């Protein structure tokens, strides 16, 4: 399963670990993803989605209507 948020499209980014001696090694920054069961009123069913913390905040503000459009 890929580490991509279904709502915001966030995916891993890459950067460097930098030590005190300024040695650099490549690092992968993972998005803060959570698997959630969400009740979609329009569909009258539970949907299991993998969303980021930012997407959960968006859903709490706007509701699940935006999510229902993506599922169809």
Curated annotation (Swiss-Prot):
Gene3D superfamilies, sorted: Ribosomal protein L28/L24
Cited InterPro entries: Ribosomal_bL28, Ribosomal_bL28/bL31-like_sf, Ribosomal_bL28_bact-type, Ribosomal_bL28_sf
Disulfide links within the chain: none
Keyword set, alphabetical order: Ribonucleoprotein, Ribosomal protein
One BP term from GO: translation
Pfam families in alphabetical order: Ribosomal_L28
One GO MF term: structural constituent of ribosome
A cellular component annotation (GO) from this entry: ribosome
Family under the similarity heading: Belongs to the bacterial ribosomal protein bL28 family.
PANTHER family to which the protein is assigned, alphabetical: 39S RIBOSOMAL PROTEIN L28, MITOCHONDRIAL (PTHR13528), LARGE RIBOSOMAL SUBUNIT PROTEIN BL28M (PTHR13528:SF2)
Classification via NCBIfam families: L28
Identification of the protein by name: Large ribosomal subunit protein bL28
Organism in which the protein naturally occurs: Chlorobium phaeobacteroides (strain BS1)
The encoding gene: rpmB
